[in-house]
């Protein structure tokens, strides 16, 4: 987007790392996109135990980070690594810090280090220890041992190298009472969507499902203890109110792996959460987003959630063909996914979704069938078309299966696999390069997705905006047109490639179309914002310090 109007530059604006005054005994380094609640909880728990701790954004760069660490001389430097794709970046940083003279104990945590500690320690010799699984208690004990000059290698929940061999202690049990943890530390200014401050919150940890491509359930099932733990609604709302008052947060992003709506217990929990949102005034003054499975999307429940502030639902649909759902072990049906989307449309709740156009079971025909499924759900322009390829993350069942089949390819940081029809390997590569301006990073689909999130944020937090319906119609028309172009490209190119013809893949033509579509989107958006600049600015600048204002009840 251009530089006019609220939050025009991008969907989220990253603020510089916030300094802490006291020398930090622990410095945690990682990405801070949309906040990093994992690091935030670690810092909060460390401080509760009398340990000075801080967070550092990894994108501050090696020189700035080294300078900061040399000034503060922390006892422990912790690296927060979720995806193995970033391992080279983390290792280069660790090497740079050692070369600069940083002598702190280097530890690392996250999904990949926890599940593949032997692989990581073998390929990342700068690391002294791995904190495995949930790290709050383990990190505190590690700091205590190092502070006292005692041997730390016997504490639960770590891995390390001794005498050239990788060793691991028994896994520490998961935190069973999430409400026993302090609210996570948030040293960064809230990111913004549509000009409104937004921050992540967490109502639960864990996932009851066993999707074959996902490392989340493996992460929680490998450690002892109850897999899914849910916070009390009272505590969740207390945290939201605190963020509303202190930071003016009006948009909350629930980062739960699977928002806890399953079964009767989940419905009762949701009812209490919504009741407390209404009683506190949050339902009238804030909106929130969740991620959940399609089977949880029930009309009555989600209508009530919408009234309590729900505005955006993310679902991992992943496939529109039975073979894909089966190999991904989604334990879902095509009809359930279609029904969920239809329900959200009827309730006028914005949605987004994950979708793997390519998976290990893919054929040229299934790719076209998946496009047909996508056309059913987003052919009307209700959301942009997005898709990806399933990747075999470390610690996932699908990675082990592909290895047994002899199809696993790639390397440590870029795992890959062969399709059963080897022609699909080349087709995927060419298609991915062709549609890069469309579906990658800040491509057209992401720009459209942000536009939908933004208009819904505007409409829900600033009712009565001039031209909102017309803008939505124009946005839907543009989205539908872009989706259909993408669908036809995949259908025509896959059929042609299957028959030995690559001519439909024209990256320059696609890039030119995406640029034209982005220009149209910017123009549409700018006209709408310009027509409503005063009411939008008034709402963005509302003083939230005294708490939400309750609307009068109509009897």
Where are the regions that the model predicts?
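Flexible glycine/acidic-rich beta-alpha junction loops that bind and position SAM and/or redox cofactors
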Residues: 117, 209, 213, 262-264, ...
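N-terminal [4Fe-4S]-dependent radical SAM core
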Residues: 2-23, 155, 160-203, 548-550, ...
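Catalytic cores of alpha/beta
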Residues: 117-123, 301, 361-376
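Radical SAM [4Fe-4S] cluster-binding motif and immediate context
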Residues: 179-351, 359, 372
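Glycine-rich beta-alpha loop elements in corrinoid/cobalamin-binding modules
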Residues: 15, 25, 31-32, 38, ...
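Hydrophobic/aromatic residues located in beta-strands of well-ordered beta-sheets
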Residues: 26, 106, 155, 252, ...
């Amino acid at each position: 987007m251009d530089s006019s109007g609220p939050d025009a530059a991008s969907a989220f604006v990253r603020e510089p790392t916030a300094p802490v005054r006291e020398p930090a005994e622990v410095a945690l380094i990682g990405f801070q996109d949309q906040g990093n609640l994992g690091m935030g909880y670690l810092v909060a728990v460390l401080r509760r135990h009398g340990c000075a701790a801080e967070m550092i954004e990894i994108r501050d760069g090696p020189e700035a980070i080294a300078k900061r660490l040399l000034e503060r001389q922390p006892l422990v430097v912790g690296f927060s690594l979720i995806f193995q794709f970033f391992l080279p970046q983390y290792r280069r940083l660790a090497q740079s810090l050692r070369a600069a003279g940083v002598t702190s104990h280097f530890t690392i945590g996250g999904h990949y280090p926890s599940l593949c500690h032997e692989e990581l320690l073998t390929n990342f010799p700068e690391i002294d220890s791995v904190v495995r699984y949930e790290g709050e208690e383990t990190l505190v004990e590690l700091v205590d041992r190092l502070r006292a000059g005692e041997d730390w290698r016997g504490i639960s929940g770590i891995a390390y190298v001794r005498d050239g061999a990788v060793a691991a202690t028994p896994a520490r049990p998961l935190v069973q009472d999430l409400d026993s943890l302090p609210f996570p530390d948030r040293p960064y200014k809230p990111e913004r969507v549509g000009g409104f401050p937004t921050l992540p919150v967490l109502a639960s940890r864990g996932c009851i499902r066993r999707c074959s491509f996902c490392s989340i359930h493996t992460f929680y099932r490998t450690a002892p203890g109850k897999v899914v733990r849910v916070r009390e609604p009272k505590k969740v709302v207390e945290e939201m109110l605190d963020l509303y008052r202190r930071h003016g947060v009006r948009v909350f992003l629930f980062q739960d792996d699977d928002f806890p709506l399953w079964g009767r217990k989940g419905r009762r929990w949701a009812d209490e959460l919504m009741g407390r949102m209404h009683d506190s005034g949050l339902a009238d003054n804030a909106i929130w987003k969740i991620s959940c499975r399609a089977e949880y999307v029930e009309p009555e429940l989600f209508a009530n959630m919408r009234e309590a502030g729900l505005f955006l639902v993310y679902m991992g649909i992943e496939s529109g063909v039975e073979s894909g759902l089966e190999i991904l072990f989604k334990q879902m049906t095509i009809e359930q996914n279609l029904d969920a989307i239809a329900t959200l449309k009827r309730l006028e709740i914005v949605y987004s979704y994950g979708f793997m156009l390519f998976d290990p079971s893919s054929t040229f025909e299934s790719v076209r069938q998946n496009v047909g499924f996508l056309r059913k759900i987003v052919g009307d322009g209700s959301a942009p078309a997005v898709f990806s390829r399933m990747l075999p993350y470390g610690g996932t069942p699908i990675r082990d299966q592909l290895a047994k089949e002899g199809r696993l390819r790639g390397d440590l940081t870029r795992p890959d696999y062969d399709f059963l029809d080897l022609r699909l390997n080349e087709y995927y590569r060419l298609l991915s390069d062709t549609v890069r301006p469309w579906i990658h990073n800040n491509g057209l689909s992401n720009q459209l997705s942000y536009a939908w999130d933004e208009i819904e944020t505007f409409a829900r937090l600033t009712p009565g905006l001039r031209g909102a319906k017309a803008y939505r119609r124009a946005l839907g028309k543009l989205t539908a047109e872009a989706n259909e172009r993408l669908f036809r490209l995949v259908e025509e190119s896959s059929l042609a490639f299957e028959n030995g013809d690559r001519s439909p893949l024209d990256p320059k033509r696609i890039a030119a179309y995406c640029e034209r579509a982005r220009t149209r989107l910017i123009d549409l958006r700018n006209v709408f914002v310009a027509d409503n600049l005063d009411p939008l600015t008034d709402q963005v600048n509302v003083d939230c310090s005294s708490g939400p204002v309750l609307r009068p009840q109509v009897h």
